[in-house]
UniProtKB/Swiss-Prot annotation:
Organism field: Homo sapiens
InterPro entries according to UniProt: Haem_Oase, Haem_Oase-like, Haem_Oase-like_multi-hlx, Haem_oxygenase_CS
Site (Important for catalytic activity): D160
HRM repeat locations: 264-269, 281-286
Modified residue annotations for Phosphoserine: S2
Transmembrane residue ranges: 296-316
Modifications after synthesis and translation: A soluble form arises by proteolytic removal of the membrane anchor.
This protein's encoding gene: HMOX2
Keyword terms, alphabetized: Acetylation, Endoplasmic reticulum, Heme, Iron, Membrane, Metal-binding, Microsome, Oxidoreductase, Phosphoprotein, Repeat, S-nitrosylation, Transmembrane, Transmembrane helix
Full protein name: Heme oxygenase 2
Class of enzymatic activity (EC top level): oxidoreductase
Regulation: Inhibited by metalloporphyrins such as Sn- and Zn-protoporphyrins.
Compartments, as annotated in UniProt: Microsome membrane; Endoplasmic reticulum membrane
Length: 316
């Protein structure tokens, strides 16, 4: 009888130890930076999922001019990020995540810029106003709080390795870009043989960083700030769209920009049948004229770049 009691007590004690070990393991896992980022940015993911701009991008509803300008916004963003990563490559809170050969995108983006704009592309482009705020934030973090740089690196590169491949196919199909990669070098990671395995390595390195819980929480907060900067770009896009709509009504635009055969335009043909041609303005030509405004071009570019960044998070 006593032996049975001892055996029972031994089993109970063993179960308690196993339960305690499991609980401790779960606590440690939830304290991992990758898990904290995943849980801590869920709300940002939810907002992104309901963005019409992202849905349209997935459907291939994007024009080549906007894609060119999106590449411009990405170029300035990654130039800032990689400049600060280079500055902090020996910092203990970032050094294990320094993978220039595998991850850096500036060189690839330079090739894309040359493809879209020509050799003198640097003379033709400027950083969008809203994107400039994000660039300034990255520089501030790199120079003053480098322990938070991981928030921006993880958000961008892990997303690019995941959803970026989907975006590449969408862009090539919608814009009829060469299958050999011209114009989409940004999405090509030549030195990463297996994206899934590399992401696992990156997360393991990130989780092994010697950071206290307070710093980890600040990193999660910084990752959410990155999303907020992107959402501000959308707000600017909406405001610019309303402003330009008013400008269109006030200023007007030349009929078909004075080019092409008006009789071949479906809009004018329909209006002529209704006897309502005089005073009408083709919406297609109006839109094209609006898109030629530099201010809108760069705002739309930032919007497209934002969509790419947000969409990439879905596939992480």
């Amino acid at each position: 009888m006593s032996a049975e009691v001892e055996t029972s007590e031994g089993v109970d004690e063993s179960e308690k130890k196993n339960s305690g070990a499991l609980e401790k393991e779960n606590q440690m896992r939830m304290a991992d930076l990758s898990e904290l980022l995943k849980e801590g940015t869920k709300e940002a993911h939810d907002r992104a999922e309901n963005t019409q701009f992202v849905k349209d991008f997935l459907k291939g509803n994007i024009k080549k001019e906007l894609f060119k300008l999106a590449t411009t916004a990405l170029y300035f963003t990654y130039s800032a990020l990689e400049e600060e990563m280079e500055r902090n490559k020996d910092h203990p809170a970032f050094a294990p995540l320094y993978f220039p050969m595998e991850l850096h995108r500036k060189e690839a983006l330079t090739k894309d810029m040359e493809y879209f704009f020509g050799e003198n592309w640097e003379e033709q482009v400027q950083c969008p106003k809203a994107a400039q705020k994000y660039v300034e934030r990255i520089h501030y973090i790199g120079q003053n709080e480098p322990e938070l740089l991981v928030a921006h690196a993880y958000t961008r590169y892990m997303g690019d390795l995941s959803g970026g491949q989907v975006l590449k196919k969408v862009a090539q199909r919608a814009l009829k870009l060469p299958s050999t990669g011209e114009g989409t070098q940004f999405y090509l990671f030549e030195n990463v043989d297996n994206a899934q395995q590399f992401k696992q390595l990156y997360r393991a390195r990130m989780n092994a960083l010697d950071l206290n819980m307070k710093t980890k929480e600040r990193i999660v907060e910084e990752a959410n700030k990155a999303f907020e900067y992107n959402m501000q770009i959308f707000n600017e896009l909406d405001q610019a769209g309303s402003t330009l709509a008013r400008e269109t009504l006030e200023d007007g635009f030349p009929v078909h920009d004075g080019k092409g055969d008006m009789r071949k335009c479906p809009f004018y043909a329909a209006e002529q049948d209704k006897g309502a041609l005089e005073g009408s303005s083709c919406p297609f030509r109006t839109a094209m004229a609006v898109l030629r405004k530099p201010s809108l071009q760069f705002i739309l570019a930032a919007g497209v770049a934002l969509a790419a960044g947000l969409l990439a998070w879905y596939y992480m």
